[in-house]
Amino acid sequence: MPNFKGTVKWFNPTKGYGFIKPAGSDKDVFVHISAVERAGLSTLNENQTVEYDLVENRGKTSAENLKVS
């Protein structure tokens, strides 16, 4: 079950990435198209509410295990 909740700030499916604005935080979270596709989605919409986990890879944090809420 995802640990964090936030709102999609923007997502560009052509570029393959975007950012989520976490609830209660000003530090945006990177989200890659591969995480979106693993969630069975083709894109994320601006202002869409999502739940997610934070995963660190190569010193960078990103959203994984997305769930539209």
Residue ranges with predicted function:
Residues 1-5:
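Short coil-to-beta-strand transition motifs
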Residues 11, 53-57:
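Short beta-strand micro-motifs enriched in acidic
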Residues 13-15:
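Short, conserved beta-turn/loop elements at beta-strand boundaries and strand-helix junctions
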Residues 28-39:
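Beta-strand/loop nucleic-acid-binding surfaces
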Residues 37-51:
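Short nucleic-acid-contacting surface segments enriched for D/E, G, S/T with interspersed K/R
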